[in-house]
Each structure stands twice: as C-alpha cells, then as structure tokens.
Amino acid sequence: ALPPELVKPFTQARSIMDGHTPQILQLTLARFMEDGHYNSHIRAMRKLYAGRREIMLEAIEQHLQGIVRAARPEGGLQIPCFLEPGWSEEHTLRRALSAGVQLPGLSRLYIGEEKQQGWLLGYASLTAYEIESAMLRLANALRQGKG
C-alpha cells in the first residue's frame, strides 16, 4: 500500500499521465465499431438483460405477491416495485438487509409530498439462480418480519 502522504502526489501524477485516451485505443474502438462488433455486442446484451428482466419479474410475481407490485420497465436494468398497503418501506428495507438483500428505497427518489413507497430491484449482474435465490430470501424475511 502507498503511504498516506504519497497518495495525493501519486493521484495527481496519474491524472496527468491518464489525461487522455491513447490513439491506439481510439483507433481500435473505431475499428471495432466500423466492423459491426459494437452493434452485435449491444444486441447480445439486450437479449441477455431482457431474459434476466423476465426472470426477475416472474420471481417477484411468484415470491412477493401481496407485498409489492412490480412495474414492467421498457428499458433500464432495474425494476421499480411499489409496496402494497400495509407494508412500510423503512421496515421492508431493514428486513431485506437482514436477509442479505440490499435495496434502494423509492421514496427518496421523489420530490414533493406524495412519495411512492417501494424499492428498485436490479438484475444486471445476477444469474437466474441468484435472482431466484434473492427473491426467495427476501420474501421469507419480509413474511417472517410482518408480525
């Protein structure tokens, strides 16, 4: 590890050295795009994420019915889930964390008086197994902590 007194000088030196992208990398990326590889990559990622989104929506429907109502997003990598009446965002976030599922709350994203309660569920980096496992753990933690 770098001694604390050297962190700032090294950070400044590194920012000077890395101030621009080398031409060879720019040319490589240009060729990658010209040859259609970028578009191919985008198509593959859209297909991958659409599949994960469907798996997440199915898992929400199967395990969290009566707790949240999921909105089907047209894009993005997160699913907004709105809490059903009788469920508190603060309480559900604590219960989720106790089950090893960290969720951002929806209410903090709203300006004004009428804030929706719920969470955002991300799926970009998760496998089908991880999605199913997380939704099952989350549902169990929420249902056990309801009373």
Role assignments for model-derived ranges:
Residues 1-147:
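PLP-dependent class I/II
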